[in-house]
Design a protein with these regions (language model features):
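Short, conserved charged micro-motifs
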Residues: 37-39, 81-85, 145-150
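A glycine-rich, hydrophobic loop/mini-helix early in the fold
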Residues: 27-75
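Mixed-charge, glycine-accented linear interaction segment located at domain edges/termini
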Residues: 137-178
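Long, low-complexity, Ser/Thr/Gly/Pro-rich intrinsically disordered segments that act as flexible linkers
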Residues: 18-21, 27
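Amphipathic protein-protein interaction modules
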Residues: 111-143
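Short, internal acidic amphipathic alpha-helical interface segments
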Residues: 86-124
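Short, extreme N-terminal leader segments that mark the start of a protein/domain
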Residues: 1-18
Length: 178
């Protein structure tokens, strides 16, 4: 999983995995670097970030339909027009399905949720008065021990959620985040 090459805008590295979900686990954290500085500020959750967790049970789990389960979580800030788009959940889910179909040989038991939220701050709370986020939670079973394509698919979904242009395309304007 660590040998995967991702876009330079994404910082990818190991994080502490959950300890009680399976006999073995490993996790990667990913965050999109801020375009203005090309770094991730120390006190930031980022415009888009996520984690990909590998759970392994050599005896398998019936609900997994296999021995290796991947669990993904992605959160990204949205602007107000994106947040109210009624097709946002379907489009965000299609990013994952398409990325897995293009990169991973075969997956089973794919499931998850897509949530768009709007938060309104009141009183003495710092931050913008309104904030909009997209959350994608998904899990699937890998049928092959080669996990690099799964990491690449996860990072591709993170790229879409962050609004990064496709690889090889230059963004002539910046997308506003509110």
């Amino acid at each position: 999983m660590n040998a995967t090459t991702v876009r330079p805008e994404i910082e990818l590295g190991p994080i502490r995995p959950p300890q009680r979900l399976a006999p073995y686990s490993y996790a990667l954290g990913a965050e999109v670097k801020h375009a203005e500085t090309a770094i991730i500020p120390e006190r930031s959750e980022g415009d888009a970030f996520g984690r990909l967790i590998l759970l392994h049970d050599p005896e398998g789990a019936e609900a997994w339909d296999g021995t290796m389960r991947l669990v993904a979580y992605i959160q990204a800030d949205l602007d107000s027009t994106e947040a109210v788009d009624p097709l946002l959940p379907e489009v965000a889910w299609s990013w994952l399905v398409d990325a897995l179909e293009q990169r991973a040989e075969h997956v089973t038991a794919l499931g998850g949720t897509v949530t768009a939220t709007t938060s309104v701050r009141y009183g003495d709370i710092s931050g913008p008065p309104r904030a909009h986020q997209l959350e994608l939670r998904a899990s699937w079973t890998a049928t092959d021990v080669e996990l690099g394509p799964h990491v690449e698919a996860f990072c591709e979904v993170l790229e879409h959620a962050a609004g990064l242009p496709p690889t090889g395309v230059t963004d002539l304007g910046s997308r506003s985040r509110a």
